[in-house]
């Protein structure tokens, strides 16, 4: 069975917290957990550790899920607003994971924040706020994307678009990192998917394929998952 690691979201203690909430909590949103396990894959949550290289040796692939902002400090900027300071602890850990799995030749798939993290890990930067792509509707917020002609996603899906996706974010890729190519854009030009140009599998989408299951008109998230798992089994 294919063994996939997923980096956790982190819930940090807040002022006035009591009980278990005085501790750092590691968690996974159920939607992405069930999506990954809908195929023949065994999922492992990877708690904070300095053993990223050991995780990379033991597992077949890595998934980076959504969650908190990337700290602008990670790409050499100051937060434009205090609430956009992000989670530097998670940033540093996930950057280590991306580098370890890539060095081991293991595939990496980024979802939402994961796409931004991969871009930053490889030397890119982010727009700190894209208000038009943010919504309180969460998994009901959708827009169209166009797949880049000749891209891996265009080959995977057999067309370039437009196709609807669930996409909720207020940060987005600004300066594309070396070693990445654009795979899809929103109608306003915002980068919505990237892929590594090297020999290993590295793909990331700004949208949430785990929310697409069975919804008419939405890009099939299963095809992307199958591509990632095929790379993990190679």
Residue ranges and their predicted role:
Residues 1-107, 120, 127, 131-157, ...:
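N-terminal beta1-alpha1 cap of cysteine-dependent amidohydrolase-like domains
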Residues 110, 114, 119, 123:
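Gly/Ala-rich beta-loop-alpha elbow adjacent to hydrolase catalytic centers
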Residues 202-206:
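Active-site-proximal beta-strand elements of phosphoester/diester hydrolases
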């Amino acid at each position: 069975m294919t063994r996939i690691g997923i980096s956790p979201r982190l819930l940090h203690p807040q002022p006035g917290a009591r009980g278990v909430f005085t501790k750092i909590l590691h968690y996974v949103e159920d939607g992405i957990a069930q999506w990954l396990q809908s195929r023949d894959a065994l999922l492992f949550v990877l708690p904070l550790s300095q053993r990223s290289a050991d995780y990379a040796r033991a597992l077949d692939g890595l998934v980076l899920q959504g969650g908190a902002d990337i700290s602008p400090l990670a790409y050499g900027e100051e937060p434009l607003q205090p609430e956009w300071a992000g989670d530097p602890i998670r940033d540093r850990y996930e950057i280590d994971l991306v580098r370890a799995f890539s060095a081991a030749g293991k595939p990496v798939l980024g979802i939402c924040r994961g796409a931004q993290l991969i871009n930053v890990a490889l030397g890119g930067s982010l727009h700190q706020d894209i208000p038009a792509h943010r919504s309180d509707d969460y998994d009901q917020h959708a827009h169209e994307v166009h797949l880049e002609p000749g891209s891996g996603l265009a080959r995977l899906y057999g067309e370039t678009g437009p196709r609807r996706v669930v996409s909720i974010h207020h940060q987005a890729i600004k300066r594309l990192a070396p070693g990445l190519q654009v795979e899809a854009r929103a109608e306003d030009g915002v980068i919505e998917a990237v892929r590594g140009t090297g020999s290993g599998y590295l793909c990331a989408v700004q949208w949430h394929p785990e929310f697409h299951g069975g919804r008419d008109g939405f890009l099939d998230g299963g095809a992307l998952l199958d591509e990632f798992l095929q790379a993990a089994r190679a």
